[in-house]
Amino acid sequence: MRSAKLKFEKRRSRIRHKISKTSNRVRLSIFKSCRHIYAQIIDDSRSITIASASTLDEKITTLKKSYCNIDNAIKVGEAIAKKADSAGIKEVVFDRGGYKYHGVVKALADAAREKIKF
């Protein structure tokens, strides 16, 4: 039986392969740790990061022990959407990074979806 980490890595690579194969748009990539949430808009054709936002930004969060919650995910989603809008990006592909689409990931995606088309 495979370990949970190996299953997660396989799921992540399968999702990224499907995204890169089917689209020439930039992707909104999500990473979450136990304490923080990160979002990046990446152009794979040029291999550059266009915009990024996370709970490490002082404008987004206040002092707490853990920043990985739905309220902060909404703030990160709004921040990445604002940065994408200022960079002239109107359409992205959502890369959930192997995480289930619920909770923090869903909140971030819904907040970003208000300004960016998925």
Swiss-Prot record:
InterPro entries: Ribosomal_uL18_bac-type, Ribosomal_uL18_bac/euk. CDD domains: Ribosomal_L18_L5e. One of its GO terms (cellular component) is cytosolic large ribosomal subunit. GO terms for molecular function: 5S rRNA binding; structural constituent of ribosome. The keyword Nucleotide-binding does not apply. One of its GO terms (biological process) is translation. Keywords: Ribonucleoprotein, Ribosomal protein, RNA-binding, rRNA-binding. PANTHER family: 39S RIBOSOMAL PROTEIN L18, MITOCHONDRIAL, LARGE RIBOSOMAL SUBUNIT PROTEIN UL18M. This is one of the proteins that bind and probably mediate the attachment of the 5S RNA into the large ribosomal subunit, where it forms part of the central protuberance. Part of the 50S ribosomal subunit; part of the 5S rRNA/L5/L18/L25 subcomplex. Contacts the 5S and 23S rRNAs. Belongs to the universal ribosomal protein uL18 family. This is Large ribosomal subunit protein uL18. It comes from Rickettsia akari (strain Hartford).
